[in-house]
A protein has these predicted regions:
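Class I SAM-dependent transferase core
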Residues: 1-37
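Generic structural signal for residues in well-ordered beta-strands
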Residues: 13, 91-93, 161
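Conserved SAM/SAH cofactor-binding pocket of Class I
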Residues: 31-115, 120-123
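Conserved Class I SAM-dependent methyltransferase catalytic core
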Residues: 18, 141-173
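Mobile active-site "lid"/loop adjacent to the S-adenosyl-L-methionine
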Residues: 117-146
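Short loop/edge segments at beta-strand edges and connector loops
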Residues: 15, 95-96, 165
């Protein structure tokens, strides 16, 4: 079932109770990234889900915001939220795989990479029976190494990588 939530910044987001809905991690990450974005920077959110992070960063100084998402249904939700808020000139949602960013973007094309990656290693923890939710929570379609590799490819020299990682995952970085 779809719902439309109003965000603190006044924008609206379309969410689906059958899919992964955003949580406090995305809000905190957006706040952290917001403060560090400089005027005119190009920002990409890897694994954007329903597009919450680009929506929360809309009033930042970024020149452009891009969300990359592998799940087609999430791409649709995110794109409809962008359209609902008349933000098509600022936010672009791309359907694609983090492991294939070179097929979608030129090397070094972003100043900032933001991501709230799956926080569970695939074999750990109980997986949700919903594939959509499991993909968002567990390293099923990508892992932290894939995300770091994508960020390395996408970031300009001296670019910024803003992410949320559980403490027990920090050793991978």
């Amino acid at each position: 079932m779809e719902i439309v939530d109003t965000l603190k910044n006044g924008y609206k987001i379309i969410q689906d109770s059958e899919r992964f809905k955003f949580g406090i991690d995305a809000v905190m990450l957006s706040h952290f990234a917001f403060e560090k974005i400089r005027n005119g920077e190009n920002v990409i959110d890897l694994g954007t889900g329903n597009g919450i992070i680009p929506l929360l960063l809309t009033k930042s100084r970024a020149k452009s915001l891009t969300g990359l998402e592998i799940q087609a249904e999430n791409v649709d939700l995110a794109q409809r939220s962008v359209t609902l808020n008349n933000l098509s000139d600022k936010i672009q949602i791309i359907h694609g795989d983090i492991k294939s960013v070179s097929e979608k973007f030129p090397k070094h094309s972003f100043d900032v990479v933001v991501t709230n990656p799956p926080y569970m290693i695939n074999e750990h923890g109980k997986q949700n029976p919903s594939d959509a939710k499991s993909i968002a929570r567990h390293e099923i379609l990508c892992n932290l190494e894939d995300i770091i590799s994508a960020a390395d490819y996408l970031l300009k020299p001296c670019g910024k990588f803003r992410h949320h990682t559980l403490i027990n995952r920090a050793k991978v970085l």
